[in-house]
Amino acid sequence: MKKFVPVLLAACSMLAACSPNSGNNNKNEAISDAEKLSYAELVAKAKEEVGNNTVSVYGNSSQLEKAILAFTEETGIKVNNTKEGDADLYNHLSTAFQSKSYIADMVLLQDGNMLQSEMLAPNYLLNFVPKEAAQNVAADDTVPMAAVYLNKVFMYNNYNSEGTEHSLTNYLTNVWQLAGSASDEGHIANPSFKTPTTENVNMNFLTMLTSKEWVDKLTVAYKNFYHKDYVAESDYKNIGYKWIAEFLKNSQAHSSDGTACKDTAKAKGGTVALVNYNKIKDLKDEEGYGKENVANLTFPSIELGDNKVDGFGGFCYKMYSMVAANAKYPYAACALVSYITSKA
C-alpha cells in the first residue's frame, strides 16, 4: 500500500479542483413521457415494450440484484444484471457507448465525479425522475437520481486480548489513532481499507478530507489527540494530506468490504476496518471468539453517540440509477428506476 501514497496524494490534488456539479438533467422523448406516468402505468408500457425479451442492467451492488429479482417477481419483466467493480463497470460502459453499441437499459453507479465526467457530460446516460419521486424526494437527490445512500464506517473487533469476552470499549475515539506513528499513545496499526485506486468512492472520501471543512475537523482532532496545535509542514499542502499519507502508510488493503467485514468479525480484538455498513447483513449468526457474528463488532460512530469519533466515524455516499441514452427498453428502465427508488 505504501507505494500508492504519492500517486493517491497527486490524484486527490487533481480531484479536489473538479468536484462534481449538480449533474445534467438531459432527457429523450421516452423519458419525458415516462416522467408523466405513474409506476403502474410505467409497468404496463414496459411489459408491452419488452414482451418476452430481457432488460439489461449493469451495476456494482449486491442489493441491486435482490431488487431486480423482486421487480421481476412483481411485474413478470425479465431482467439480466451484470455486476462489476467500479473500474470495470465504467470501462465497459464507456467502450460500448463510444462505439454506439447497446450494452444496458438501466445502470446503477456510485462515484458522482466519474458519473458526471464520463457518463452525463457526453450524454451516454440520461436522468429519469419518477413521478412519485418528484413529489417526495429532495431536489438535490433527483439530479442525478439517487437510488440509495450508503455508509462506510469504522468498525473494530470488540473481544479482549484473551478472546474471552466482549470487553473492548471506546477503542477508536480519534481518527489520528489510525495515522501518526506506532509511538503515539492509542495508536492503532493496520486498519483495513479498500484500495482507493479500485474503489472510486474511497478516493472521493480522501479527496473530501483535503477541503476546508474537513481540514478544520482534522485540525481540531489533531490538537485533541496530540495536545498541541498543528504546525504546517512543507511536505503537505494541508493537514488533510498529512492524515491521508499517514493513514495509507499505516493501513492494509482489502479487495472486498464484505470479506473485510467477515474477517474483522473473526479476527483478534482490536482489528479495525473501514467498510460498507450494509455488509453486516452477510455475517453468519455464530457465537464465540473467532466466529463470524455482528456481536463481535463495535461501530465507534454508534458506540460514542453524541460524542462521535473525533474527526469522523466514516462517510456517506450515494448510488445513482440512470437510463442509457441508447436503451432498447427505455420504459422498462424507467420502471425499474421507479421501483428501486420507491419500493426496493
Can you describe what each PLM-predicted range is?
Residues K2-L9:
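Sec-dependent signal peptide recognition
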Residues S13-A17:
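C-terminal motif of bacterial Sec signal peptides marking the signal peptidase cleavage site
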Residues C18-K27:
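Bacterial lipoprotein signal-peptidase II cleavage site
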Residues Y39-K47, G51, N60-K78, D285:
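Short, polar/charged alpha-helical segment
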Residues V55-L69, N80-S94, Y102-K262:
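Extracytoplasmic ligand-binding site segments that recognize negatively charged/polar headgroups
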Residues G112-E118, A265, T271-I302:
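A ligand-binding cleft/hinge motif common to bilobed small-molecule-binding domains
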Residues A134-V137, V148-V153, Y241-F247, E292-A325:
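Periplasmic-binding protein-like
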Residues V153-N160, T207-S211, C316-A332, I340, ...:
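A bilobed periplasmic-binding-protein/Venus flytrap-type ligand-binding module shared by bacterial periplasmic
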